[in-house]
Amino acid sequence: YNGNHGRGISIRLTSPEEVAEGFAKAREHSRSVIVETFLEGDDHRLLVVNGELVAATRRTPGHVVGDGVHTIAQLVEEVNTDPRRGVGHEKVLTKLELDAQADMMMARMEMTAASVPEKDRIVYLRSTANLSTGGTATDVTDIIHPDNRDMAIRAIRAIGLDVGGVDFLSTNIAESYKSIGGGICECNAAPGFRMH
């Protein structure tokens, strides 16, 4: 397990302090730390079984949407009343948390848990889109571009798996990575299925 479920992952680090904090966070979960180029785009999980793409989802980081009335803390409480949300993997979705990572994300927007975001403003509480950290998933199987599908199948075949999940970053999954960029973040030999 090195960084599974988004543990120890930090993205969009822009200052030396953020890099140092991200490195320290990663070291809490593994003695080895990998630093990679940041790829712009939405987080997708492409599920390949026996050489076929069987499902694709776009994952969105845990967030709240402002209403101009309630604080971020109150909005988190409201989101967490959704009966589909639980602790860990007990339910389809995981409850949102106001913790150090959420504080860092809010600080980037010059906000705190006591801030009242304007109506329709999205406030991300995580930089990664894992369901295990409060993220949500949207099915995109029917719109994935054939080049992106084939790339996922080739990746899983290249590492010798019958079942695998490809974490793929793209600004538009319906367009080819060959024309708009994007790329594989990682391949998972034991991918979670609950997002599909």
Language-model features and meaning:
Residues N2-N4, A113-A137:
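A short, surface-exposed helix-loop junction/capping segment
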Residues G3-G6, D120, G164, M195:
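Glycine-centered small-residue hotspots that permit tight backbone geometry or close packing
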Residues E78-Y124:
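Oxyanion-binding "anion nests"
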Residues Y1-E97, H145-D150:
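Active-site nucleotide/adenylate-binding loops and adjacent lid/helix of ATP-dependent enzymes
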Residues F38, V48, E52-A55, T60-D67, ...:
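ATP-dependent carboxylate activation and anion-phosphoryl transfer catalytic cores
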Residues R12, S115-V123, A174-K178:
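Short, functional N-terminal and low-complexity linear motifs
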